[in-house]
Amino acid sequence: MNRKILQLAIPSIVSNITVPLLGLVDVAIVGHLGSASYIGAIAVGGMLFNMIYWIFGFLRMGTSGMTAQAYGKRDLTEVVRTLLRAVGVGLLISLGLWILQSPILRGAFVLIDATEEVKRWASLYFNICIWGAPAVLGLYGFAGWFIGMQNSRFPMFIAITQNIVNIVASLCFVFVLGMKVEGVALGTLIAQYAGLFMAFALWLKYYGRLKAYIDWDGLWGGEAIRRFFSVNSDIFFRTLCLVAVTTFFTSTGARQGDVILAVNTLLMQLFTLFSYIMDGFAYAGEALAGRFIGAKNDVGLRRCIRLLFLWGIGLSLSFTILYAFLGRDFLGLLTNDTSV
């Protein structure tokens, strides 16, 4: 069982760690363009997209659990329906984001105190990258579905490919074609759709036989769709609470001065690192527990929960000890400012 957990958790951890690299690459590129306003624009735009997409993370989490349950039951029709529902809901949400992009941007600038120059470049970045919403949310559905099918390697391959495409495209647009923030935004946009197309290609190649189980008539009706929205609404509100807490943490620190804000930002980096690793085991839990529930394997389910609980305790204690004794050293790698 531990082997199964690690086989699912480790690729998921790698995938999670690559997520912030997309934004980091953008910042690194504009950081060489000679204006701090470019960096500020990417920071503001990146933060805004992170909050938006984090809120809709239920498309991945809910999909993985429900796919795993259908897979455990060997109900291949419901397996396919779950993917189609997730991608369909993602496309509908994307349409809403497109329609509301101007109010969203104006609301963000009310909350974010930035210079007019930063707002101008951030608006350009946002108005380009928002067209990638279908790719991002659609990929959430595919990633959750792959994990539910006990396959966390495909999301890892997709995440790595996205980073490579983003780096190459952004470098070409900025340093070859002479673009600025818009070049970085276009590179990110291309990488997002490259990830979605890769997910679809992998699905066709390795799961194409499931096309025979597509049932359009039962896609949006019955108990299954009620459960789909019931589970995802719970996850949605849970995520809203997390976003509210982290936003409060950042905004409160900002009101207490630059030093406190900097300290809180560094501490959040340590917290984020821990979260990415723990989330890998959470994904493994979603896939395995869902499969055991679907197969009505109570013995396997109890053993899975017990082992995941032990992994959680072990990792929590390990990180607590690590941060307690080496916390200052980790912070020293992130900054040399003695006031922080």
Task: Describe every region a protein language model picked out.
Residues G96-I128, S318-S339:
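Short membrane-interface helical motifs at transmembrane helix boundaries
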Residues A114-T115, K119, F126, A133-I160:
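Cytoplasmic helix-loop-helix junction between adjacent transmembrane helices
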Residues N163-F197, G327-G332:
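Membrane-interface helix-loop junctions in multi-pass transport and translocation proteins
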